[in-house]
Each structure stands twice: as structure tokens, then as C-alpha cells.
Amino acid sequence: KYIGTVNTKDTNKQELSNMMVGRPVQLQVNKDEAHPGDVVLSVKGFTVPSHLHKKDAVHNVSFDVRAGEIVCIAGIDGNGQTELVYGLTGLDKPSSGTITLCGKDISHASIRHRGEHMSHIPEDRHKHGLVLDFTLEQNMVLQRFNEPRFENHGFINNKAVRDYANYLIDKFDVRSG
């Protein structure tokens, strides 16, 4: 969709942001000073091999995340962000390093166990975050389908799924279409 063309000298950050998003964007956010808590995630000497090259996709990375912090992994495509996330979440196997979550070593924990305390928002939600043939309700319980409240004698409890989906839709102002 074409939005517009402007000369660099005739525009500013605000106008460009508004054009990119399609509505007025607030560029200044007033917020209280951060008071990060204790370290909840500690990654040390983390290496994930590349499936495409001989060189590691992620090599000897170390960092800490404190309670109250939100971490975003960003970079140019092909620089190892995806492999880092896959290694942390258990979708890929690192060749070395440790992951400590809430004081417990989860370096060899299952994906399900890691998911109890960590969340991942995929870069491409259509490719990795959703089952496009499923309904919105079904997608909302993908990671929870095994919970007793969504099961009824071996079958999906559709009413419970619908109620939970409606709860999430209201809580997070989810819009589909």
C-alpha cells in the first residue's frame, strides 16, 4: 500500500513514524525510573552451532536478565538471533554453555519445562507462532492443550477453550480479522 513520498529535508521523525504506522505515534514515553530485581536468567558461555555453516551461529554468549526486564533480541538477518532464541527455548541444541533460570540449571530441561517460566514471541508469528488452519481459540491454547481444564475424557473441552479464549481476548484487547 502506497502511503506517500517526502523529501528528507522536509520531514521529521514524527511525520515518518506516523506514516509508517498509519496513525499518530507517541515518540516520547514518560515512565518511572527502573528498579531491576535479582537476576532471573543467566546465560554463560552459550554456543549454538549453525546448520548452514561451519562457523557457530552463536559463539560464547553470556548475559543476565533481571526481574522486571524485558529482553528483545534484534539484529541483521543471519547474525544468530534465531539460533540464540532456539537454543534458549530448547528448540535447538547448544554445543556448550549453561542456562540458569530462577536459580535452577535448565540447560538440559525439556521445552515444556522451560516454557513454564519463559516466553518467546517468534519473529514470524505466521510461520512459527500459529497453526493457520486452526481457529483463534485453538491457537490460544496450543501450549496449554494438555491442561486438565481443556480436556474432557480424552477430547478437547470446546467450552473451556472458548471461555479461556474470550478471557484472553478481553484481557489483552485481541483483535482478529
Predicted regions located by residue number:
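Glycine-rich phosphate-binding loops of nucleotide-dependent enzymes
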Residues: 1-177
